[in-house]
């Protein structure tokens, strides 16, 4: 029972780690997004200005000590600020989960992986690898637009403040749907790399 709990807490750690890496890597690849997505033509601001405002937003979302969101070049509505506050809480929840489950992951590596007991969890790992693939295929079939909408409807039940009006919250113009598509693809690659590696390792004799 204790071993199973350690395993699933470790899987939760890897899941949260995949999310956090995606979030923090956004700081690195966003300058490329500005160029690839021609964001300067959407808001008529210099790339440096767009990036500066993005950094302010990301710092607010990821830093628990940052409590006020005020982007110098983008006004925000009450609904927009509410949505970002909700997202901030979700990000902090993921950070907390990663910290709480980190010790379990350490025990998992030392007590299960290194001692050769990973094969006992092969079926569980396979399920964790296949499930996101099936979800991804579903997303491809219905189109990312529909998938993105469904994702928000599930994550923010009864809250439609994620539906930004560019006239009231122009920051959405520098956060186009394609940017989130790239973030989803990055998360998928990280997630499948972690869990795929463990599954393949569990199958080795």
For each predicted feature, which ranges?
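Juxtamembrane non-transmembrane "cap" segments at the membrane-aqueous interface
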Residues: 141-166
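Transmembrane alpha-helical segments in integral membrane proteins
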Residues: 11-18, 95-113, 182-205
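Juxtamembrane interface at the cytosolic side of transmembrane helices
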Residues: 102-146, 197-205
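Solvent-exposed, non-transmembrane helices and loops of integral membrane proteins
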Residues: 162-177
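Long, glycine/tryptophan/cysteine-rich extracytoplasmic
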Residues: 19-86, 159
């Amino acid at each position: 029972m204790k071993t199973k709990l350690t395993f699933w807490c470790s899987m939760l750690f890897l899941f949260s780690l995949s999310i956090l890496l995606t979030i923090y890597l956004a700081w690195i690849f966003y300058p490329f997004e500005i160029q690839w997505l021609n964001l300067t033509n959407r808001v008529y601001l210099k790339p440096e200005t767009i990036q500066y405002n993005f950094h302010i937003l990301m710092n607010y979302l990821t830093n628990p000590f940052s409590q006020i969101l005020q982007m110098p070049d983008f006004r925000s509505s009450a609904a927009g600020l509410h949505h970002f506050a909700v997202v901030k809480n979700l990000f902090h929840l993921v950070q907390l989960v990663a910290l709480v489950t980190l010790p379990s992951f350490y025990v998992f590596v030392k007590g299960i992986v290194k001692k050769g007991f990973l094969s006992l969890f092969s079926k569980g790992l396979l399920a964790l690898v296949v499930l996101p693939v099936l979800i991804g295929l579903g997303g491809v079939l219905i189109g990312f637009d529909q998938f993105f909408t469904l994702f928000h409807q599930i994550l923010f039940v009864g809250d439609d403040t994620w539906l930004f009006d560019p006239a009231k919250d122009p920051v959405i113009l520098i956060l186009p749907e394609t940017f989130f598509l790239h973030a989803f693809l990055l998360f998928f690659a990280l997630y499948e790399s972690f869990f795929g590696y463990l599954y393949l390792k569990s199958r080795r004799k």
